[in-house]
Amino acid sequence: MIRHIVTTAIGKAVRGGMRLRGGGSALPGLVVEKIDSGFIPRALQDLPYGVVVVSGTNGKTTTTKIVVELLEATGLKVFTNRTGSNFSRGVAAALLGEVNQRGKLDADIAVLELDEAWAVKFVQQVQPKYSLLLNVMRDQLDRFGEIDTAASFLEKIAAATTEHVVLNRDDPRVFRIHEKTSAAATYFGLTTDLLRLMPTDDSLKTGDAVANESVPAEVVLTTVEQQGAEFLIDGTRHRTEVALSGVYNLLNAAAALALVRTIVPEAPIHVLLDALSKVKPAFGRGETITYNGTSIDLLLVKNPSGFRLSLLSFGKRQRQTMIAINDNYADGRDMSWLWDVDFSVLENVSVVSGVRAYDMTLRLSYDEVAVGTVEQDLAKALDEFLVHEPTEPKQIFCSYTAMTTLRRLLSEKTDVEDIS
């Protein structure tokens, strides 16, 4: 107990210092990891509803946000790593912001978004009561190498889960995970028609994807509308308005509904759907920022499938478009995956920026997409973008570190939600 209190004091002191300096959200967590590897397990050990791990290639941050808001609608007090820092140091940093001076966490349940590889290490220390496994897709090539490696990480998360795993029945690699765990399994999914709007690395643009409808699912996404969605739950179709856009975000919503109904089975469906209708996009994941009366959508892209789905959902909109691609560690160094994305849906791109601006411009040229300005410096590029057709709505497709930089730059010009 004394060690836990001392670690908490040191961590909070580092966190306070970093906040005064205006950065380093995960650094306090890194310090705590170095001095006391048992801090996270101790802080999470007494939660009445236990720990939930959300993992997979795409959709972790958005899905976690939905899960948290739905659980809160049922009356539970939820701890989460809401900044999207999904390594264990991010969890530790988030804990430092929530525990009291003695290191006690006041919460009913913890819902944690975790990177697939780091989740494997995490579950060796903290066994989750529930896990939600979304999908397995090719991510940055220099991270995991093979798609089956990523699948093996999710298998280990499931094997460590003590009570219940919630799986995507329509992702073959995720569906097979039920064979690797002793925990009970629940499924979510979507219809074949909707699945074909989401080409995977296995069935890219072939149109031959078929939903695994022979497997009963707790929640099935059946219809996607401009500002609404329909879900099949307990044999009944339920329609709700939504603030989230895109088939993939609404599939994330189906996943979240399935998980929450597993954790709180007595929760009324209408309460969950009402809460879902109010969920706004997670930061940088379709988040809308207003500048001088004009909307700017930040659209995170980090792998072929994610970029393809973003373009399918948003590429045809009549908006000024910017693309910003970096190759820092958090983005992935190997950006050759950009050649696996079809950009022909874009008529033109006003500004291309980031460390890989010229690589991105070359890629666009092969799909005959006209480019206005190429400027590697993100600050200069953003200024150029904002004055170009200033009254027209805008969208920025951006890699992770480009997104966080652009978000910070925009916060210096207009109101941006503080997620620290």
Where do the protein language model's features map onto the residues?
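A generic structural signal for short, well-ordered alpha-helical segments in conserved domains
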Residues: T64-E69, V78, L257, A357, ...
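Phosphate-binding loop of NTP-binding sites
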Residues: I2-A184
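ATP-dependent carboxylate-amine ligase
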Residues: M1-S25, G29, K180, A184, ...
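Acidic, Mg2+-coordinating active-site environments of NTP-dependent enzymes
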Residues: Y49, L133, M137-T294, V371
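Gly/Ser/Thr-rich loops at beta-strand to alpha-helix junctions
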Residues: N58-K60, S85-N86, D171-R173, Y248-N249, ...
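Short, acidic/turn-prone active-site loops that include or flank metal/cofactor-
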Residues: T83-N86, N135-D139, L190-D193, N326-N328, ...
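Structural beta-sheet core signal
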Residues: L112, S131-L133, L167, Y187, ...
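Buried hydrophobic packing segments
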Residues: V67, L71, V91-L95, A253-I263, ...
